[in-house]
């Protein structure tokens, strides 16, 4: 129901703003909005088309891992933690391995691997779901972990900063890591409170503290490197790990006498089917966002926030980067465009340019993930997924602003 109201609101607000624009003399406003519907629907299909090959590849690899027993080994290894974080999932269920693969891919910034493994996890959780059109607690927790977007290697952002001539492209690395860690911890805590999961259980608490320590070690390690070394290490590590996972699954299949090629083809067929299923959901959410943005409502929201901050007598320097923060839950490509625009207009080494990069790396595209993940299994009632995801995003935004002032203010 929440997505239903949000989607309707996109169009109603857009129409109201279009009428205001027309009254102020903008006779092209309705054409802009209508054009955005065609552009957004085309973009949604192109995204799905682009996902088809990637989904086929990674679901094929995952199928090899399933038949070789690798996924079950991962599930058993992670059972002590995941059975407490996802109490409704049976112990040692194969979905635990898929969840781990997805989280690991996200942490390494490997989006091409994260989405297929995430969709595989959703399909496995749907098999346990007694109400097929309603999201379960494990699905929501998993979704929030994705929307909070814990990434320890933000390779793309660092590459963009280098291309825009930043003096130190990697100077946002530690701030991004700190902000995304806050967003992830906030997402886990908020969702756990909502689902009445006791996060003070020794195993869970130790895991969260261990995660903080792990990120701290990475921050310290990369802090000892110069920018060229950091870029080389991050790129090399992420790609070596990715290729290592593929090789591990294939060799495990060979060792277990699995017909690796046939298993891959079987999984790849599932990838094509999944890509087709998500098209209507992507079209719906991207068209709604496109209409909202084309009407000028997004600009008005940003101007309103800027005015409110200034009236309170606070430092409003961060407002220039807010378009990236506001766009991020709605559209990944839109937020990326806002980040690049901020670096172009203000400079990559300006406060706004750096903060926009931290915003881009601190959370993920909540509504896109909702549309793709829930759409792949035909979930229509997301329950508290939207609220928890957006609250985690808000925590990430607040953390990003705070960290930016600490490092660059």
For each feature predicted by the language model, list its residue ranges.
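Signature of multi-pass transmembrane helix bundles
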Residues: 1-53, 159-293, 311-312, 384-409
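Hydrophobic alpha-helical context, especially transmembrane and signal-peptide helices
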Residues: 5, 32, 44, 60, ...
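Short glycine/serine/threonine-biased micro-segments
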Residues: 12, 58, 67, 107, ...
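Membrane-embedded alpha-helical segments and adjacent helix-loop junctions characteristic
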Residues: 30-127, 256-345
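Hydrophobic alpha-helical segments, principally membrane-spanning helices and signal/leader peptides
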Residues: 35-38, 45, 94-96, 131-139, ...
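Generic signal for short, ordered secondary-structure residues
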Residues: 100, 104, 139, 230-233, ...
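C-terminal transmembrane helix pair
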Residues: 113-114, 121-161, 166-196, 322-409
């Amino acid at each position: 129901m929440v997505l239903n109201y949000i989607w309707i609101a996109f169009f109603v607000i857009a129409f109201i703003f279009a009428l205001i624009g027309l009254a102020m003399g903008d006779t092209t406003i309705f054409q802009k909005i209508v054009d955005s519907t065609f552009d957004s629907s085309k973009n949604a299909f192109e995204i799905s088309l682009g996902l088809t090959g990637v989904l086929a590849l990674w679901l094929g690899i995952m199928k090899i891992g399933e038949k070789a027993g690798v996924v079950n080994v991962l599930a058993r290894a992670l059972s002590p933690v995941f059975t407490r974080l996802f109490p409704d999932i049976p112990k040692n269920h194969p979905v635990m391995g898929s969840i781990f693969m997805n989280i690991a891919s996200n942490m390494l910034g490997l989006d091409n691997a994260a989405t297929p493994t995430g969709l595989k996890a959703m399909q496995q959780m749907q098999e346990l779901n007694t109400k097929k059109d309603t999201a379960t607690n494990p699905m929501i927790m998993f979704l929030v972990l994705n929307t909070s977007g814990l990434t320890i290697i933000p390779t793309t952002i660092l590459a963009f900063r280098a291309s825009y001539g930043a003096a130190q492209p990697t100077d946002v690395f530690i701030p991004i890591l700190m902000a995304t860690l806050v967003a992830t911890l906030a997402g886990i805590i908020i969702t756990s409170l909502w689902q009445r999961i006791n996060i003070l259980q020794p195993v869970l608490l130790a895991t969260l503290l261990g995660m903080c320590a792990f990120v701290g070690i990475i921050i310290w390690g990369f802090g000892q490197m110069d920018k060229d070394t950091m870029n080389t290490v991050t790129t090399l590590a992420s790609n070596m790990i990715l290729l290592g996972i593929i090789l591990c699954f294939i060799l495990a299949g060979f060792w277990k006498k699995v017909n690796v090629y046939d298993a891959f083809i079987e999984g790849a067929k599932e990838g094509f089917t999944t890509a087709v299923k998500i098209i209507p959901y992507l079209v719906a959410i991207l068209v709604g966002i496109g209409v909202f943005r084309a009407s000028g409502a997004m600009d008005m929201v940003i101007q309103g926030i800027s005015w409110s901050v200034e009236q309170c007598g606070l430092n409003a320097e961060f407002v220039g980067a807010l378009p990236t923060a506001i766009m991020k839950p709605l559209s990944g490509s839109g937020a990326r465009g806002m980040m690049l625009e901020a670096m172009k207009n203000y400079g990559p080494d300006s406060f706004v340019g750096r903060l926009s990069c931290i915003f881009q790396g601190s959370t993920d595209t909540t509504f896109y993930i909702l549309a793709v993940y829930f759409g792949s299994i035909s979930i229509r009632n997301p329950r508290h997924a939207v609220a928890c995801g957006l609250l985690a995003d808000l925590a990430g935004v607040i953390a990003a602003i705070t960290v930016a002032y600490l490092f660059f203010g």
